[in-house]
Design a protein with these regions (language model features):
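Hydrophobic membrane-embedded alpha-helices
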Residues: 2-123, 128-297, 302-338, 342-346, ...
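Glycine-rich, phosphate-binding/catalytic loops in enzymes
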Residues: 26, 144, 436-439, 487-489
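Structural recognition of the beta-strand scaffold that forms the well-ordered cores
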Residues: 28, 97, 419-420, 440-444, ...
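Extracellular/periplasmic envelope-modification machinery, especially enzymes
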Residues: 338-468, 479, 507-515, 521-522, ...
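Short, conserved loop/helix-junction motifs that constitute active-site signature segments
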Residues: 462-465, 490-496
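A short, conserved alpha-helix within the catalytic core of class I
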Residues: 482
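A general structural detector for well-ordered alpha-helical segments in enzyme core domains, enriched
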Residues: 485-489, 516-520
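Structural alpha-beta junctions
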Residues: 492-500, 522-531
Length: 587
């Protein structure tokens, strides 16, 4: 439940809990422990492992809730714009085929910065989990066929787990130094599977029914207080990581994920000791209930949250998401899963006989299936948002090409002394740049951050092509370490040049963007050659341009948003021209 809590906090309140994504690693560690411990117990009891039975149990636990989630979510997609169902057929195929992680890598997905988030991107973790179940179950079964000593069997599993853990972790550690998009590491079945094997190592040292002599000794030697304090300490350390880690920081991949997994093993071990120390204690019913529905809540919460945040405030969206997720995950665990497995159905202490209602159940499932099929058929391959960005990119390229031809022909005055280095917001404003600032050189791209922009900035300085005024419009993708990032532009700016910084805006992250904006205003006070184009101020004054948007890219139903954006930059350019350039004194 700790893992689910951190994931929910991260998704619902990412600014306050930036490292909550480690909740998935807690899931992975616990799954590795639980599956391995159960397999060892089965071998200890029966001297063999029923591989097909293992796969069957995993299938009934994982697949029905997943399919139910997809079927239930599809009708809700008609409440939001079609961008959210673009290529939905491919997303569904990846989800039910347990290849979402590969799908996101191939399509260039970024876990944190998708402007139109995929509704089923969260099933990437389910894909890696299924890969682990398939391979690990087969390997442990194979080992059980060739060993008849439980102690040696445990020892061998520990050794192999340790080797797999080391290989997977080293893969993440080394790749962290060489990739530009860390999501390719995060989504990787190879690089991100080490928590499972760390959990498996703990399973060989503890077990569930069949435990080790060392573990039994610790149960006797540890006080109950020590067990509880160890659990509390491990939870506190995980919470500390939740506040300290950032998704795109290298240290997260070098040490963050492995520390989260290690702290999770501490919690698992202490919980197992405490469980055996208090055999007659009963867990509160609410704890058992949350443990039962946690998988379902994980499945349902993300698509519901994405949809509801487009319809209401974040706080209300969180409340509605939690309610809907609990309702459907409860029905899934207590009704659907046992019904499909041929077991008795029991809900709220009542035995339910669903056989008289089979036609209604199958009819409802068929109807939802038809809705899903129709949605797949009518959904666009590419959403309007991506299409508009593509069109703007082509327009930008053509405009820059025309300017190059003009300069080559000898008319040097055709190219102004203003260059805009921008992100997708600037790219979305290409048409307005052409009409309001036709002489400005615009270089904009999707998901561009300060690091990308600084590379362009340095290249222009080195090649002697830097315009007299550079407009830096990339802040919304660079909300971490912004002070250092901005300072490098100021320090590198040559004498005789001016810098304009466009303040960022994100309706879903106002607190952090305001913090960045306030700091950027201080830079204009400190350096007379730095001017601020206050897009944040213009954006907050015009809420009408944000209706039905992602909160970062204004509505393109008309040119209002684009014109406001470019006019803010235009105003700053005019103001900057009246101020001295770097190295010049005030007149």
């Amino acid at each position: 439940m700790t893992g689910l809590l951190l994931v929910l906090l991260y998704h619902f309140f990412k600014t306050a809990f930036p490292g909550g994504f480690i909740g998935v690693d807690i899931f992975f560690t616990f799954s590795g422990y639980l599956i391995t411990a159960l397999l060892i117990d089965e071998y200890s009891k029966n001297k063999k492992i029923d591989l097909l039975g293992f796969y069957k149990r995993r299938f009934y636990r994982i697949v029905p809730p997943l399919v139910l989630m997809i079927l239930i979510v599809m009708p809700f997609t008609y409440l939001v714009r079609k961008d959210y169902v673009a290529s939905i057929g491919s997303q569904i195929a990846a989800a039910v085929g347990f290849t979402t992680n590969f799908y996101e890598i191939i399509t260039g997905g970024n876990y944190e910065t998708q402007f139109i988030p995929h509704l089923f991107v969260h099933t990437w973790s389910l894909a890696i989990e299924m890969h682990f179940y398939l391979i690990w179950g087969l390997l442990v079964w194979f080992l059980s066929k060739h060993h008849d000593n439980v102690a040696k069997f445990r020892s061998l599993i520990f050794t192999i787990s340790a080797a797999f853990f080391a290989g997977s972790f080293l893969s993440m550690f080394i790749r962290a130094f060489f990739v530009d998009n860390v999501s390719t590491i995060y989504f990787s079945s190879l690089s991100h599977s080490f928590p499972f094997f760390l959990g498996a190592m703990v399973a060989t040292m503890t077990g569930i029914r069949e435990t080790t002599a060392r573990f039994k000794k610790n149960v006797r030697l540890w006080s109950t207080k020590r067990s509880i304090l160890t659990m509390v300490l491990s939870f506190a350390l995980l919470l500390l990581l939740t506040f300290a880690l950032k998704f795109d920081q290298r240290i997260t991949y070098l040490f963050g994920f492995v520390l989260a997994s290690l702290f999770s093993t501490m919690m698992i071990y202490a919980a197992r000791v405490l469980n055996d120390q208090t055999p007659n204690a009963k867990e509160p019913a609410i704890i058992n209930y949350l443990a039962d529905v946690s998988y379902g809540v994980y499945l349902f919460h993300w698509p519901f949250y994405i949809i509801f945040t487009q319809l209401m405030s974040n706080g209300l969206a969180v409340l509605v998401t939690v309610i809907f997720s609990l309702i459907f995950s409860t029905l899934s665990f207590y009704v659907l899963e046992p019904f499909l497995a041929g077991k008795s159905v029991k809900l709220l202490g009542l035995n339910l006989d669903l056989h008289p209602y089979q036609k209604w159940l199958y009819g409802g499932g068929t109807l939802l299936g038809l809705v899903t099929i129709v949605t797949i058929i009518i959904s666009p391959a590419v959403g309007d948002f991506e299409t508009s960005l593509l069109v703007n990119s082509l327009q930008q390229a053509q405009t820059n090409l025309n300017r190059t031809h003009t300069v080559t022909a000898g008319d040097a005055t055709a190219l102004s002394d203003v260059t805009v280095i921008g992100d997708s917001v600037a790219l979305r404003s290409s048409a307005s740049f052409s009409s309001l600032l036709p002489d400005a050189q615009v270089d904009a791209a999707v998901s561009r951050n300060f690091d990308d922009a600084f590379e362009i900035f340095q290249n222009e300085i080195s090649s002697g092509t830097l315009s007299q005024t550079t407009v830096l419009a990339v802040g919304v993708n660079s909300l971490d370490n912004y002070q250092e990032d901005l300072q490098q532009f100021i320090d590198a700016l040559p004498d005789g040049y001016r810098l304009i910084i466009v303040t960022p805006y994100n309706a879903n992250n106002k607190a952090q963007v305001k913090e960045v904006r306030d700091y950027e205003l201080t830079l204009a006070d400190t350096y007379n050659y730095v001017t601020v184009a206050d897009w944040y101020k213009a954006a907050t004054k015009h809420p009408e341009i944000w209706s039905g948007t992602d909160g970062v890219h204004y509505s393109d139903s008309d040119t209002t948003g684009a014109d406001l954006y470019v006019k803010a930059i235009q105003k700053a350019i005019e103001k900057s021209a009246k101020n001295p350039a770097k190295g010049e004194s005030d007149s």
